[in-house]
Amino acid sequence: MMRFLISFLPFFFLVVVLQEATCFNQHKELSHNIRNKLKGRLAISLSHSPSQTAKGGSRVVYPAEYGADTSGARDSSDAIIKALEDAFSLESEAELLPGVKDLGGVLVDLQGGNYTISKPIKFPSSAAGNLVVQGGTLRASDAFPTDRHLVELWASSSQKLSKTASFDDLYNRKLQQPKGIYYEDITFRDILFDSGYHGGGIFVVDSARIRINNCFFLHFTTEGILVQGGHETYISSCFLGQHSTVGGDSGERQFSGTAIELASNDNAITDIAIFSSAVGIVLRGQANIVTGVHCYNKATGFGGIGILVMLAGNSQTRIDNCYMDYTAIVMEDPVQVHVTNGFFLGDANIVLKSIKGQISGLKIVNNMFTGNPNAKVPIVALDGVFGNVDQVVIDLNSVDGMGLRSTVGKQSVAGNGTKWVADFSGVLVFPNRINHIQYSFYSQGGPNNNNNNKFVPHAVTNVTNNVVVVESDKPVNGVVSFLVEQ
């Protein structure tokens, strides 16, 4: 038996070696065939022009293949515009909104390039959506026009708004705009927009559900982001500044421009840092929400504004969980606006500016204010006179080194006599305005603690200039606790 095993082993090894050699030759031949096929496909792919590839159904468009210079040495405006035109020309039977072609998620990939731009990258006027532009840098050249934006989404039939458009203008424009939305579901992500002190970053008109995510806007002189008309533009996780600084810039007094301006409804600004500009955010539309924003643009002491809420009388705006760093919130005739859970540093406050003297549905609650105790800047200040005030609650704010202001006042006054005076003029926001009064009268007896005078008639006898007076018909040693509301 042992002899048989010994004689069999050489034959077994010979078979194994032959099998391995055969497998190796087959694997080598297969690899050779695969390489030849890949080379053939690559040659076919390279033989097509970029426009033919896009029209043929490719879902990724590379501007570099159209002649865009990723190094920034040459102008790439025309190449990027041509790439967008080919992306918009992709055949599709599907639609998003009526008349808006669904491009199926086509991707315009900047491939991390640094592109020099001499004219705006204007999207085609044909209505379309479901497209992504990502991953690169767009820099304005010295020839770039100072009144335009690096990227512009507006159709030739769209109507641009003036800088002073009011709610009535927006409302009438909406009624007179039968053609509606031209762009939908377009995403910009991971892009640096460097305007080179020539104009702005991105301009969006008559569009719906636009996303601007994880982008950086630098060196703008007009607006970093400007949105007009349409609705539901979501701006998130972005940084915006005219000058690259981390605060305390020696040229802060000269900061100009606006980081974000929304002349549009139903938009959201989330998790944004604005580090240099004259104005951080301008809101000229309704039903917008601003949350998680850090504004340390030009300080209010230098004439800057962190957030400006316009659209007097129709604001309907929510500002939550924001950090106002030496820069104020200014609201014009705010109606249905709330400011909550914010942090105001360096005498940053909230200014209510009168246009027609109307305030309604305003809520400023649960915020923290910190400032210079020597200045005692009021946390809420009035700019003008308000004659129509309704449903305003300013309360429950914590204050350190600034002047507390509220629409609710509490005070206890002790005295031995017939009159108790509570002065709320240093606390209440609106002058000479108290709508509700509650008070409790605690009598400790007569002037000599005579119990015979513990129960005496008393009443509010005067309410003028936010001063409340309570009087009794007999002298008494008592404490009066007041609660007033505006």
Language-model segments: residues:
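Right-handed parallel beta-helix
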Residues: N130-R139, Y182-S195, A208-H219, H231-D249, ...
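Extracellular beta-strand/beta-solenoid scaffold signature
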Residues: I80, E85, S118-F123, F144-K179, ...
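Short, conserved, surface-exposed binding loops centered on an aromatic residue
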Residues: V282, M310, V330, V413-A414
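A structural signal for short secondary-structure junctions
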Residues: L311-N314, Y323, D333-V335, L345, ...
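Extracellular "leader-to-stem" segments immediately downstream of a signal peptide or signal-anchor
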Residues: M1-Q134, L138-D190, G247-G248, V393, ...
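Extended, hydrophobic interaction surfaces within ordered domains
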Residues: L5-H32, V339, N349-S398
